[in-house]
Amino acid sequence: MITLNFIWNSNEIFFSLLGINIRYYSLMFVVAFSLGWYLTKKIYLNEGKTVEQLDSLFIYTAIATLVGARLGDCLFYNWDYFQHHLLEIFLPIKEKPGGGWELTGFSGLASHGAAIGIILAMFLYIRKYKDMKLSWVLDRIVIPITIGGMFVRFGNFFNSEIVGKVVSNTFPLGVKFVQGEDLSTYKAMSITGANTAKEAYYQIVHNPQYADILAAIPYRHPAQLYEAAGYFVLFWVLWYVYWKTDKRNKPYYIFGLFLVRSASWWNS
């Protein structure tokens, strides 16, 4: 059998600017927001809405997404850590073990928190524009949100996070996530004696001395790529429903399609 499985040890940093690391994950968010604005503009202009209303929606959505996703990760998933590092919730820094602070950027974001944040923000948005109903807004913003979800999952893949279940070495699509949950940064640096995580993982992959360590890392489903493909398909379904059918006039219909499909992924 021909297999496509491979070892994934990506450099999550796209480039550095003035000492600040720009990560692929952050880049994917920029792409998602930019494309989302463009797609929503087509929808808004099609329905006679103004650019002012569009720009306002973009601001509400962007802030709600980032704040909601950040708080969701900190409060729902990593509160044991952040309750002792409250400043790190709001600032892109991390406390060094030996004292002091390191500028790291925000790395923890949760889609559940983003979803809650966006819905709450839409309540504020429709209070500003009395001619809009919540159902109308939600039915339309989930379309660009869906394609945005695809790019966010690409970012998760670059970060080696949200990995899938373990598969056999012969599974055609298996991926060995070297920087995933099976080999912590601390353990990799301890084994190799490297001074940085990047160097430690490089040694694990390329130095024959650590071949047994590399072999012990299991292949896993690339769940991020599966979900990215699913979001891509769902986007075209919702796009078709909006532009080619009259279902867009049925309150919460498109939003409901989005929820049903997305909920099945979140629970899988």
Label the model's feature ranges.
Residues M1-S268:
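A feature for loop-to-transmembrane-helix boundaries and adjacent hydrophobic helices
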